[in-house]
């Protein structure tokens, strides 16, 4: 992420103002493929959704995504989920939202927006186009 992002983010100058826009497409899964160790945390994180302390649980377990030294204060980000888990029923999306929000806020993202998986592709495409044109 950092390798490509840092060189492509435009910075405001005295004569030009920029708003960078990033669209991130994620599969919506919490664990990496074939990584059984990752799934041990899922029950704890699901419980944290019910209690309402997902961010605290992520921090307590030391699961925060490491911050990279990139200033996103002039950047708006849209994160799109493309694959809802049948077993999660929205839970994985909420946990991913907590992870990504925490991480991007620590890099001062100007605006963070999430798009839950849509059944119709054209709805997703329209939402992405609206985000870019804003």
What kind of region is each of these model predictions?
Residues 28-32, 83-86:
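Solvent-exposed loop/turn segments at secondary-structure junctions
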């Amino acid at each position: 992420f950092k390798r490509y992002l840092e060189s492509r983010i435009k910075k405001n100058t005295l004569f030009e103002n920029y708003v960078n826009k990033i669209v991130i497409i994620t599969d919506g899964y919490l664990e990496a493929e074939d990584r059984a160790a990752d799934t041990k945390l899922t029950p704890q994180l699901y419980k944290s959704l019910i209690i309402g302390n997902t961010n605290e649980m992520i921090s307590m377990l030391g699961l925060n995504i490491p911050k990279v030294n990139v200033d996103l204060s002039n950047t708006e980000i849209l994160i799109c989920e493309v694959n809802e888990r049948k077993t999660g029923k929205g839970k994985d999306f909420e946990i991913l939202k907590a992870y990504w929000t925490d991480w991007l806020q620590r890099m001062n993202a100007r605006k963070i927006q999430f798009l839950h998986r849509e059944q119709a592709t054209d709805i997703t495409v329209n939402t992405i186009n609206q985000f870019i044109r804003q």
